[in-house]
């Protein structure tokens, strides 16, 4: 019985029991729990016509895989809770 109990405890500790990642999400830039299967946080930045005066556009969110982006769009992906804060303007 002790061996069986030990195996059950080890199994529970080794399994990811429904853990979901938390990421910052735009437009509110608040931390939210990602949907099941989306364990990647991303920060996507790009320039639009107002880039010179307003700075780069920023999109924050969750994804199942790191999004593929077009030329001129920067993407940073990470996989820990709230690892995608709104970038500081330089």
Swiss-Prot record:
Similarity remark: Belongs to the three-finger toxin family. Long-chain subfamily. Type II alpha-neurotoxin sub-subfamily.
Compartment(s) of residence: Secreted
UniProt entry keywords in alphabetical sequence: Acetylcholine receptor inhibiting toxin, Disulfide bond, Ion channel impairing toxin, Neurotoxin, Postsynaptic neurotoxin, Secreted, Signal, Toxin
Protein name according to UniProt: Long neurotoxin OH-34
Chief subcellular location: secreted
GO cellular component: extracellular region
Role played: Binds with high affinity to muscular (alpha-1/CHRNA1) and neuronal (alpha-7/CHRNA7) nicotinic acetylcholine receptor (nAChR) and inhibits acetylcholine from binding to the receptor, thereby impairing neuromuscular and neuronal transmission.
N-terminal signal peptide: 1-20
InterPro entries linked to this entry: Snake_3FTx (IPR003571), Snake_toxin-like_sf (IPR045860), Snake_toxin_con_site (IPR018354), Toxin_cobra-type (IPR054131)
Organism: Ophiophagus hannah
Disulfide bonds: 23-41, 34-62, 47-51, 66-77, 78-83
GO molecular function terms listed in the Swiss-Prot or TrEMBL record: acetylcholine receptor inhibitor activity; ion channel regulator activity; toxin activity
Tissue: Expressed by the venom gland.
């Amino acid at each position: 019985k002790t061996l069986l109990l030990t195996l059950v405890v080890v199994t529970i500790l080794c399994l990811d029991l429904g853990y979901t990642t938390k990421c910052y999400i735009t437009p509110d830039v608040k931390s939210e729990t990602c949907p099941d299967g989306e364990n990647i946080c991303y920060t996507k930045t790009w320039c639009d016509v107002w880039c010179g005066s307003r700075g780069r556009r920023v999109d924050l969110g969750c994804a199942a895989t790191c999004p593929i982006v077009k030329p001129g769009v920067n993407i940073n992906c990470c996989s820990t809770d709230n690892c995608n804060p709104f970038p500081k303007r330089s």
